[in-house]
Amino acid sequence: MCIRDSDYPYSKVLPNALVTVKPVDDGSYFLQLDDSTTLLPVNMTSSPFGQKEVRALVNFDETNESSGIYSKAVNINWIDSILTKPIAPDLGVTSNDSIYGSDPVEIVNDWVTIAEDGYLTLRFRTIWGDRNKAHFVNLLTGKDPENPYEVEFRHNAYGDVYGAYADGLVAFKLDSLPDTNGKTVKLKLKWKSFDGDKSVEFNYCSRKSTPAKASIAAERSALNLK
């Protein structure tokens, strides 16, 4: 029997949230949706990511079950972790270039490119030839002594610079930056694009969210990253 397109639950295919998966000491976990909203998964009682705190795309439905101390109870339809990394150590100009690379990317302005909950999550676009070859992506602190909230995105393609454009997702934990102590500051992101050096600013507050875009990403990161 053939399934008609109209029968296919497209609402279950796309992510409807970007969350932080937060393990709890008793082996359970919850999802941090935004600055004030927490989600309790009731159909998946242990995190598929073990005791790791990670950023993830998720598709969920709210339920009427008890959420206890959390804001809402949800059923998870699917959840897919995003590569989640700390800020990388500064190795000096020469070593930074040789190890972290300086290959160009474009930062995509959509709902998953956001500073929230102590993370900078980025959707980026670059050229990919060999999908089996991992590209190395990192976030470094900036060189401006007057601005401790300046960071730089680095990309090492390891010579894989011919092919088609494709998108990747990565999240960086910002806990090594100075605590904003409840204040909202400007987080400046710098990167090398295909058109030269670029930068953008995000509203950033330690462990506090900033508004997301309303659109939905059509696909998850399908690229090999490390």
Give the residues covered by each predicted segment.
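First exposed extracellular module after export/assembly in secreted or surface-exposed proteins
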Residues: K12-K226
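Conserved small/polar residues in nucleotide/adenosyl-binding loops
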Residues: M1-S6
